[in-house]
Each structure stands twice: as C-alpha cells, then as structure tokens.
Amino acid sequence: HLDHHKDMQEYIDAKRNILIHQVPPCREVLGYENEITRGMQADCKGKQVWFTRLHETDNGAFLRDDGMLCMAEDGVVTPFLAQKDVKLRGLHNIENLLAAAAAVWGEVPVEAIQKVGSTFTGVEHRIEPVRVLDGVTYYNDSIGTSPTRTIAGLRSFNQKLILIAGGYDKHIPYEPLAPEVIRHVKT
C-alpha cells in the first residue's frame, strides 16, 4: 500500500480516517498484534472486532493454543477451523484468515468460512509455487515488496531458502529484514 502514499504516516492517517468516519453498524476489524492499530481503538465509532494469533479475545477471531481458529462474540467462543486444515503457508496467512473471518462472521454461513479456509491455496505472486526442477521448488513472492512482507514469506518455510530479491527504496526501515535473512536464507 505504500506505493499509493508518500510515507508510512500518510498511510496510517488514511486508515485512521476510515475508522473516524465509520458509524454503527459498521464493523471495524483491527489487528491486535499491531500496536499502531491498537492505538486507533479510540478512533473507532463502529463495532470493534479483533483478530489475533497470539491472544484470546472476547470479540473477534483468534488462534487458540490447541491450533483451532475461533470466533468470540461477547465472550462466547465458537471454534470454526483447525490450523492444520489451512492450505496457505505461513502464520501471516493465518492472521489474514482470522481477519477475514472477523469481517464476515454472522454475515455468511460458518460452513462457507470453513470451506474457503480449508481449500483456498492463494493468489498469484504471493508465495506461489511456480515450478519444480531437479527436485527444487521455485516460489514467486513478488508481492512481498516490503521488509514486513518479505519476512512473512521467509517465515513460511521450515528450511533455509535461496532468496532472489530486488526492487526500489520505499523509504521504510530495512533493518528488521537482516536477522531474518541470516536465519532463513542459505549462504
């Protein structure tokens, strides 16, 4: 999204502006692990629902310690999908699925959420398997154009990778990427 904003602050302000202008019965889906998002809580005028893979919540979608994706409404918890049944790679995709479930819960049948969560295999350019050649699988993650997205992609694999990266400077910090490259990339 930074391709459409002059810097990170403008992007944050645009997101905050959406929250400020929403009114009930609008649903505001907020990521609990993101401290910037948590800081926007006071700007919310609609119904707040959270998504989190590290904490349980009384209102929103979360990943329970036993590996179940759950939805809570006023403290009533409904497990809806086992993490092991999700086809997408990476914990960031678990977070995406939790956010999607929080956004549509009560508007679409739970069975539809379960079906999508257990059958959807991804979109082009996002950790997309491209080819297997001589026992090596090649993935296209060209959508990963920021350090955060590149880190999420690297963390999606259990083995060290060969990374081919490039792009242009978006004027955001790249320092968090260095230890992840050391940890996840073959040298």
Question: Can you say where each PLM-predicted feature lies in the sequence?
Answer:
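Cofactor-binding loop segments of dinucleotide-utilizing enzymes, especially the Rossmann-like FAD-
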Residues: 31, 53, 166-168
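Short, glycine/charged-enriched secondary-structure capping and boundary segments
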Residues: 7-10, 42-45, 63-65, 153-154, ...
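Short, intrinsically disordered, charge-balanced linker/junction segments flanking boundaries
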Residues: 55, 184-187
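Phosphate-binding loop of NTP-binding sites
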Residues: 1-32, 36-46
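Extended acidic/charged loop-beta regions that coordinate divalent cations
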Residues: 1-4, 38-84, 123-126, 130
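Nucleotide phosphate-binding/pyrophosphate-handling subdomain across enzymes
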Residues: 80-185
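Residue-level detector of structured alpha->beta connecting loops
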Residues: 23, 45, 158, 185-186
